Amino acid sequence: MIPLLLLLACSRPFLDAGPCQERFTGPGIAECEVPGWEDRAYDLVLPPDYDGETPVPLVLALHGGGGNKQAAERTTCSEGEVEDESCLHKHAQDNGYAVLFPNGTGFGLLPELRTWNAGGGDDEWRCASGKACERGIDDVGYIQDLLDDVEGRAAIDTSRIYATGLSNGGAMSHRLACELSDRITAIAAVGGANQFTTTGTCAPERPVPVLHVHGTADPCWSYEQGSPDCPVGGGDLPHVGVDRTMDEWAALLGCDGGTVEEALPDTAQDGTTTVRITWTGCEAPLEHLRVEGGGHAWPDGYAYLKEKTIGPVPRDWGNELIWDFLGAQEL
């Protein structure tokens, strides 16, 4: 597999993470190991007003296929600079929530090029993504152990734990909503639809609020069902399309009132525009931000490869809309 986020995995700088603590009593950034999971450390960013006692919301930020936790830290920054105020972790620090950047599984000669087992994988559907999926890595189990470890070290509001991610990380967010709904409050998936349902059954224990973000000009996870047309490798098997994923969630959430569409302001004039589609009559919020002309990138995020490879990066909005959706949800 030629990793989509190769440049992210090999670039610097990264967050300056300090040593892990048995119990965090104040703000900061630290790298910790997950017990029982070799070589799958995570970075935890706690907000400046964290006091070790008052529980804070937590966003789980999952890297794309071929990336890692450091790559995820840069993906959400407009210029890829982790000190920039545009980054997800900077937004978190300004708004009083924590961010968790975990590692998927690496293999072979390039172990820092990691993937998540987001599901799929048979004679008809792509395995998302790579060897983590092909080898059946128990990433749902990993996330459970990861959350156990974080909750044991820091004061986390367990009614407000969210998952987000790009591409393979977005698809993994969908899988967590299907299989870990007792712990994941809501998800915001970017550029990665629910591949898990192509070979597995999505049966959440509770209605999970879902936001899905996707560009209509995404060559790496095409908006319509199809095979990728960018350096991700893996043959000709397709990714699931966005319409199927949204229809499935609408059925699972009992949405029976139709949809409402709203055009968001075109402030950047970057060749992309965004339409917010909201399903009504649902047991939990369901929204889709359809980025007309948008590529395989985090909104107002890092253009980690050239536009001819991943398509345009939308600049009209960014982490604030993702947090607006997630932060409004509670178990």
Positions of the model-derived regions?
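Sec-dependent N-terminal signal peptides
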Residues: 1-9
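Extracellular secreted precursors and ectodomains with disulfide-bonded cysteine-rich loops/domains
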Residues: 8, 18-19, 30, 75, ...
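Acidic glycine-/aspartate-rich tracts in secreted/extracellular proteins
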Residues: 49-50, 65-67, 105-109, 217-219, ...
